[in-house]
Amino acid sequence: VVMENFDSNEQMYIKVANGESYDILVPSDYMIQRLIQEGYLQKLDHSKLDCLDKLCEDVVGLPYDPENEYSIPYFWGSVGIVYDKTKVDLEDLEREGFDIFKDQKYKGQIYLYDSERDSFMMALKALGYSMNTENEGELQAAYEWLVECVQTMDPEIVTDEIIDNMAQGRKALGLIYSGDATYVMSENEDMGYY
């Protein structure tokens, strides 16, 4: 078995689009949809998958592959905030939510995940908009929110290194996937997930 890890869906997409061949890919929902639309995925042979009837109904038949012809769920989670309980006031998190990433109290103490999709989700949620909006005004406001955050908060923009860095308590808070946050919290009892 040869396994190759990618820092992002986009890195994986470039390899696939340039002709690299893989037996199994583990991308996110939006990338599955793109790979299907562009003809890069083969249909699954459901007769060889004895687990289909055991999958949670909440994660099958999703809009990007309604019949699960090309994909089955591997895991699911959310994007949230990992924080150092010794450095971040829980009341700040509860009051500010994602706006905590613009709280000057934490300037220079934040990680942002190097993902356009996740960053825009954070900004849209902070502004009270749907993370799936197509409204140009809302998207522009989210862009401006992100620009202000980067220009005023001195964030470190990272990918998977956030996991070990937060486990070691190097910053106060960061945008992270829930599964990664679970690992961080298992390594450092001072860490929480919001």
Question: Model features per residue range: what roles?
Answer:
Residues 1-34, 164:
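Early extracytoplasmic/lumenal segment of secretory-pathway proteins
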Residues 19-21, 27, 67-69, 76-78:
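Extracytoplasmic
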Residues 77-80, 121:
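Small-molecule pocket liners
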Residues 86-95, 128-134:
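Short helix-loop capping/hinge motifs at secondary-structure junctions, enriched
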Residues 111-115, 119, 123, 131-194:
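Ligand-binding pocket segment of bilobal, Venus flytrap-like solute-binding proteins
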Residues 33-76, 90-102:
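Hinge/lid segment of periplasmic solute-binding proteins
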Residues 18-27, 40-41, 106-109, 168-176:
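Alpha-to-beta junction loops
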Residues 99-114, 127:
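Short loop->beta-strand "edge-of-pocket" segments that line small-molecule binding or catalytic clefts
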